[in-house]
Amino acid sequence: TLLTSLVSCTTYHPAGKKTVHAMRTGNESFLTKINFLSDLNWFLVHYSPDIIIVSDSSDRHGDHAALIELLQNTNAFHQIPICLTYIIHGGNDALWPSRNTQKFTRPPVCNSKMWGERISISLTKQEQEHKYNATLSFATQLKDDLENFLISFSKQEEIFFLLRDNINPQKIYSHVEYRENL
């Protein structure tokens, strides 16, 4: 469901369900940074996830890169045991991800060290088909996709990067260090 906001922007939420803000307050409201952070913090406290997976700060799409920074501004974020990141816009959307490979190649925004420490999760054929079909359901995102950008994420693996592991706190990766070494 696409919900028009009070400031002429849109937000996505499950069909027939309330937005997080309405769940928290009982009312809809303006989509401001303060409201978003309050809603996000409430959601994290209310549902207490064991793991969170969020777009990486090195993602070249501004709102994707900003999400991790917004999350880090919530009190509840630091209580989540494990945080993984992923990249969608890896530096050149026309070339990455490769359109003709079954596995991901290193995106331009990753140096060799970051790429070497990635977490790769193999997908079954059925999982690949589910991902492919799920991607096709985002018609508004596919309409201008002459390069099959979104479809190119349907591969034999999913890749993630470990940002924080409170269970093994020595495994904290410095993304600032990665960007400086690119």
List each language-model region with its residue ranges.
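Metal-dependent de-N-acetylase/amidase catalytic core
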Residues: L2-L182
